[in-house]
Design a protein with these regions (language model features):
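Glycosyltransferase catalytic domains, chiefly GT-A lineage
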Residues: 1-164
């Protein structure tokens, strides 16, 4: 099963996604990997570097999706100062509609992660009827309370296995 990895980035973070992509390819040598970058504006130079990556690592397939128009339609949450959150975090909720419809699963990774091993076992994990798998935050109750969330089902959204 080919691993499909998705990122939500803007021009400030696309270079870091490139580092994650490199770690994924090197740790999974010989495996075909699809990379899906849902972007809030990246430069032509960024696109050129991604094309260079594709030439260096021919087992990697790269798809770039411009999410700016869709992000413009999402109302910014009340009570959260704009300087505290980058709107590219909302690309996660757009991914199911932006990636190709034939994809049934993606592994979402934040641009500040690294791949330190094989992805196949994690990617093949049986989610049962759950829509996604993610790690619980260690201090979930405190974080949930801080943002005014009811309950304590707070998870780390930086690494998510998502069934589409």
């Amino acid at each position: 099963m080919r691993c499909e990895i998705a990122f939500g980035v803007d021009a400030n973070y696309v270079k870091y996604a490139g580092i994650v992509m490199t770690s994924a390819v090197l740790q999974n040598a010989g495996e075909a990997i699809g990379f899906h970058l849902v972007c809030d504006g990246i430069t032509e130079a960024d696109c050129d570097r991604l094309e260079d990556f594709r030439r260096i690592f021919p087992s990697a397939d790269i798809h770039i999706y411009d999410a700016r128009a869709r992000l413009d339609e999402i109302p910014f949450p009340k009570g959260i100062p704009r300087e505290r959150i980058n709107r590219s975090v909302f690309t996660r909720i757009l991914m199911p509609e932006m990636v190709p419809q034939e994809l049934t699963r993606i592994l979402y990774l934040d641009a500040d992660t690294l791949c330190v091993g094989q992805l196949s076992e994690m990617y093949a994990y049986d989610l049962g009827s759950a829509p996604l798998a993610a790690a619980r935050e260690g201090d979930a109750a405190r974080k949930a309370q801080r943002i005014g969330m009811r309950g304590t089902d707070y998870f780390n959204a930086g690494v998510m296995l998502i069934d589409l």
